[in-house]
Amino acid sequence: MEEFFQQLTNGLAVGGIYALIALGYTMVYGVLKLINFAHGDLFTIGAFLGLTLLTSLGLTDAIGPVAGLILLAVMVVILVGVVGFLLERIAYRPLRTSPRLSAVVSALGASIFFQNAIMLIWGARPLVYPHGLLPNITVSILGVELPLIRILMFAISVVLMCALYYLTHKTRIGTAIRAAAIDQGAAKLMGIDVNRVISLVFMIGPALGGAAGVMVGLYYGQISFTMGWLYGLKAFTAAILGGIGNIPGAMLGGLLLGVVESLGAAYISIAWKDAISFLVLILILIVRPTGLLGERVADKV
């Protein structure tokens, strides 16, 4: 039972990361009906920016580990949000009225550009986050000792997801985002600046991905310029699992995928960890193509 609880909490922590990245996919798809294939690379940029700021500014030494890491995360969120904004303005907006394939090619090109830019700036070898930034202590929950960083990762993910849900469902900005996702033409007639909404979506999604990148660096300790490919693919799987375009669905899909992956690695084989994730994707596409929380689509005859 203790082993099961350990794997469950590990799955929730990793699933929170998948969920944060998946939210970027699902927000862009909800508004533009477009898959941002460069989103995983924005997550990678967040991880590398976090390492650079951490080592160059010495925030944890100046203001303490907890306050330093919080300030670091805020800085990364802002910087990656700006990169996402520029990506939309340069790679997507000029092609908005072009055939859908043009935007897909542009997204793939942006992904290749980001990977090579990361490699040129930080090098091709994996980099390591500093050790010992947080106290190496455990917290006892239901008689099971859990690492503090695992609990913090899950808590931060939940806070960010709740903040996004509040933004999209309880504010005027969120109402504008949801209106643009339903019908851009009608949203324009209602006085909503759709271009501004799309830019905002491209800032929020990558910002969450950047925060996830920092958490991955702190949790696993090592980052590489290709890490966004696998994490992006799994987050895309999570978005489809929950229902692409559905924000609560992306949250649920990420957490479920993390738990299934963690339990599968523990009780089946760690060699099958990635395969289990994509097997879940295949099964959900067969059983419920619109995802767990996606709306069923039916043609009236």
How would you describe each model-predicted region?
Residues 1-21, 49, 60-71, 98-103, ...:
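Membrane-interfacial amphipathic/re-entrant helices at transmembrane-helix boundaries
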Residues 14-25, 38-59, 87, 105-106, ...:
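Hydrophobic alpha-helical segments within and immediately flanking transmembrane helices
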Residues 94-95, 100-170, 197, 221, ...:
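Transmembrane helix-bundle core of multi-pass membrane transporters
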Residues 31-86, 90:
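Membrane-embedded helix boundary and interhelical linker motif in transport proteins
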Residues 2-17, 167-168, 172, 198-239, ...:
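Inter-helical junctions in multi-pass inner-membrane proteins, predominant
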Residues 14, 145-223, 247-253:
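Helix-loop-helix "hairpin" substructures at the membrane interface of multi-pass membrane proteins
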Residues 25-48, 97-102, 173-176, 194, ...:
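Short, non-helical or kinked segments that cap or interrupt transmembrane helices
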Residues 30-38, 82-125, 167-174, 179, ...:
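Short loop segments and helix-boundary regions at transmembrane helix junctions
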